[in-house]
UniProtKB/Swiss-Prot annotation:
Cell compartments where the protein resides: Cellular thylakoid membrane
Subunit structure, interactors included: The cyanobacterial PSI reaction center is composed of one copy each of PsaA,B,C,D,E,F,I,J,K,L,M and X, and forms dimeric and tetrameric complexes.
Broad class of where this protein is predominantly found: membrane
Gene Ontology terms: biological process: photosynthesis
One Pfam family matching this protein: PSI_8
Propeptide regions on this chain: 1-11
Alphabetical keyword list: Membrane, Photosynthesis, Photosystem I, Thylakoid, Transmembrane, Transmembrane helix
HAMAP family noted in UniProt: PSI_PsaI
Taxonomic source organism: Nostoc sp. (strain PCC 7120 / SAG 25.82 / UTEX 2576)
Domain of life: Bacteria
Membrane topology according to the record: Single-pass membrane protein
Recorded family membership: Belongs to the PsaI family.
Protein name as annotated: Photosystem I reaction center subunit VIII
């Protein structure tokens, strides 16, 4: 039963790459760089 369920999940999830590629390529770097920029610009880092 579980082996027949897995291919249907993978077939229905073919649209996920068009969501994850922009998220990994744009959102994650923007969030990381903005956090690091705000962190290094603080007065009381330590």
């Amino acid at each position: 039963m579980a082996t027949a369920f897995l291919p249907s999940i993978l077939a229905d999830a073919s649209f996920l790459s068009s969501i994850f590629v922009p998220v990994i390529g744009w959102v994650v770097p923007i969030a990381t760089f903005s956090f690091l920029f705000l962190y290094i610009e603080r007065e009381d880092v330590a």
